[in-house]
Regions:
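Conserved catalytic alpha/beta core of Sir2/sirtuin-type deacylases, generalized to analogous enzyme cores
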Residues: 1-306
Length: 306
């Protein structure tokens, strides 16, 4: 209730962070003869069917760790990654939490900074000019070198890759072939190459010092910094959802630091098992140790927008 009361104030700027670590994107774990979703947060039959054949042929047991698997050929590498990208970037989130979050902040002066790379915020209708995806975008390729700081839309290529493996795409849903298993390789002619230097392309994901920060990335970073700069000292809610300690220096630590430096700011954290704050700002912190979906759903029942 205290968090909802703050969100419903008329004089509030809201900085909203969302980092779902496998909570709402189909990060599926396969075990025994049943589908067991990673951390038990969602049932995603479509995602599970999308990698069942890979599970049978490799040690891969969930989609995230599969991203680090050393596939034998580029054709096999892109067979896996095309499915991963399509499921996590181009399919809708399996729960309406993004839509509910938008309803909570739509009439506020908000900004979203996220380390998610699935663009669920944008698909839910959040203002693109109020979003900063710090770690990249599943929907973009970049040069693996990189020879430039450009990125390239990949939806057409990714769709061609999954269809070449036998999947069908209808109404945004990826469906495995009904007669047999998918082909665990893509045609060589579909392998993406940099249009400038010819080197292999890779995903635009921040995993090393070769991450390409294109013009769009820098424009979003500047808008975020301007948002913070022009609201300095105002009533702010730093709402942190699902952030762990994998990369706390990007969002968690700055949110805590900015709350400590602004006596009019409130820090709110919803996190299963990791809701914590600094001792110096305990009186201006709201900590909810619980499932984000359940908390947002409860707020939805009470909020005036329902």
């Amino acid at each position: 209730e205290p968090l909802l009361e703050i969100l419903q104030r008329d004089d509030l700027a809201v900085t909203l962070l969302l980092f779902f670590s496998g909570l709402f994107t189909p990060c599926v774990r396969i075990s025994a003869d049943f589908l067991q979703v990673q951390d038990a947060y969602l049932q995603s039959e479509t995602a599970a069917k999308g990698i069942t054949d890979i599970v049978d042929l490799t040690p891969i047991r969930d989609m995230y760790s599969g991203g680090f698997y050393p596939f034998a050929t580029p054709e096999e590498h892109w067979a896996y990654w095309s499915r991963y990208i399509y499921i996590n970037r181009y399919m809708d989130a399996p729960k309406p939490v993004y839509d509910d979050l938008l309803k909570l902040v739509a009439d506020k002066d908000y900004f979203v900074i996220t380390t998610n790379i699935d663009h669920c915020f944008q698909k839910a209708g959040f203002d693109k000019k109020r979003l900063f995806y710090t770690q990249g975008d599943y929907g973009l390729f970049q040069c693996s070198e990189p020879c430039c700081q450009e990125t390239f839309d990949n939806e057409k290529t990714v769709r061609a890759m999954v269809e070449a493996q036998g999947f069908t795409v209808a109404d945004g849903v990826l469906t495995p072939p009904t007669d047999g298993t998918p082909t665990m390789a893509v045609p060589s002619e579909l392998l993406p190459g940099c249009p400038h230097c010819g080197r292999p392309m890779t995903m635009n994901l921040r995993c090393d010092d070769k991450f390409a920060e294109d013009e769009g990335w820098h424009a979003a970073a500047e808008r975020y910094e301007n948002f913070l700069r022009t609201r300095d000292g105002q009533k702010l809610l730093f709402l942190e959802l699902g952030v762990g300690y994998n990369t706390p220096v990007i969002i968690k630590y700055p949110f805590l630091r900015m709350t400590a430096g602004n006596p009019k700011a409130t820090y709110a954290c919803i996190n299963m098992g990791q809701a914590s704050t600094l001792r110096e700002i305990e009186e201006r912190s709201i900590l909810i140790d619980g499932d984000i979906t359940a908390v947002i759903e409860e707020m939805k029942k009470t909020a005036s927008y329902k």
